[in-house]
């Protein structure tokens, strides 16, 4: 499975790509590995295709020890959010950046276009709260990297 995830990029493609592609690439790759070949257009791999724009921002933490999370249900129920999850457990010690160990959460967002995706991203991003025992926010401010760079960055946050 790691080989499959590595070839797809390892960023929740099992959730984000089926509505974009109209099939499930993970299932196609596994089917091909098991049978020697797999046709992505085969009906058993087909899913409903959704028009619009998508984003899968990954969130990372600063150094510290995770004490608390907030906003899970609020973010999961936010219009346009297909999936959201915190990935670290309470008590996890975060060291200097080395690899994806600091990956703390992810979002899968869908909207009618990139302007709407950016709006949803900004509104949800500011509700993600990962703190240490002193209440210090551990989430790295990487929002600017997650926004569509082709758009003006003046979308309201509330």
Question: What spans do the regions from the language model cover?
Answer:
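Generic structural signal for individual residues within well-ordered alpha-helical segments
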Residues: 27, 76, 115-118
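Generic C-terminus detector
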Residues: 89-158
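Short proline/glycine-enriched turn/loop segments at secondary-structure junctions
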Residues: 43-48, 73-75, 94-98
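Active-site "cap" helix and flanking loop/linker of ATP-utilizing ligase/carboxylase catalytic domains
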Residues: 4-69
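Glycine-rich active-site loop/lid that clamps phosphate-bearing ligands
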Residues: 59-93
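Active-site lining segments that contact anionic ligands and/or coordinate catalytic metals
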Residues: 51-56, 79-83, 101-104
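Short intrinsically disordered coil segments
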Residues: 19, 71-77, 122-126
């Amino acid at each position: 499975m790691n080989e499959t995830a590595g070839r797809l990029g390892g960023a929740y493609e099992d959730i984000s790509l089926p509505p974009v592609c109209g099939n499930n690439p993970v299932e196609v790759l596994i089917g091909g590995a098991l049978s020697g070949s797999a046709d992505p257009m085969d009906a058993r791999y087909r899913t409903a295709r959704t028009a619009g724009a998508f984003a899968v921002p990954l969130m990372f933490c600063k150094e510290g020890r995770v004490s608390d999370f907030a906003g899970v249900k609020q973010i999961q129920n936010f219009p346009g959010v297909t999936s959201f999850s915190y990935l670290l457990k309470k008590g996890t010690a975060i060291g200097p950046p080395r690899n994806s160990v600091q990956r703390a959460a992810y979002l899968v967002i869908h909207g009618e276009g990139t302007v709407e995706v950016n709006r949803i991203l900004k509104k949800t991003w500011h509700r993600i709260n990962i703190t240490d025992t002193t209440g210090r926010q551990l989430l790295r401010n990487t929002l600017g990297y997650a926004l569509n760079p082709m758009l003006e960055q003046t979308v309201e946050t509330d």
